[in-house]
Amino acid sequence: MSIEWLSEKLSEQGIELSNTQKEQFQKYYKLLVEWNKKMNLTSITDEHDVYLKHFYDSIAPSFYYDFNGQLSLCDIGAGAGFPSIPLKIVYPELKVTIVDSLNKRIQFLNHLAAELGLEDVSFVHDRAEIYGKGVYRESYDIVTARAVARLTVLSELCLPLVKKGGQFLALKSSKGEEELQEATFAINILGGNVKETHTFELPENAGERQMIIIDKRRQTSKKYPRKPGTPNKSPLVES
């Protein structure tokens, strides 16, 4: 059973899943596959692959970062809820907000949260560029993004939402270091400073991952993020 595999792998890292948490992951998988038949949530649907490449991959940052306590976490472009929903299951005190530009994914997440009995979660249908200019600007302890765009672009979408003293966690595949060199200029302009990078392998040769931890040192200039689409079309790079 894939849930037993996940439980065993997390136990090796000192994380013990309760029966309730195991049931939540099992329901999560079931709902993901059901809803995926009517909307494109993920290309990964094999049970073991979901447990490895979505659930385990989402939780792995917690091997290097402390998510305990009532921290506020905003997840940008989480799709079907990765990494924030698996993290919320393992760390129930987290206060999670997911911002996604596709309303159908928000509908799935609302249904998922109700079925899993998750509290202190909210799902916002919005563009990150607009959300980052609103009332929740510079209000989150942690902002996460998992491989949704290059780091230069992600920094402009995510750092404006991180409060001073908080952190942006960029979760990347093996090209993270290369992207980091390109993004250093943008990170600095946006008030951030790279703290550290953790590189690790997923089990079963499923690929290399990198977590880049960026401290929010200063407030972000009010001109960022720029209007929707601009960060992607014209990334902040040194001229």
From Swiss-Prot:
The keyword S-adenosyl-L-methionine applies. Gene3D superfamilies: Vaccinia Virus protein VP39 (3.40.50.150). SUPFAM superfamilies: S-adenosyl-L-methionine-dependent methyltransferases (SSF53335). It is an enzyme of class 2 (transferase). Transmembrane segments: none annotated. It is found in: Cytoplasm. Specifically methylates the N7 position of guanine in position 535 of 16S rRNA. This is Ribosomal RNA small subunit methyltransferase G.
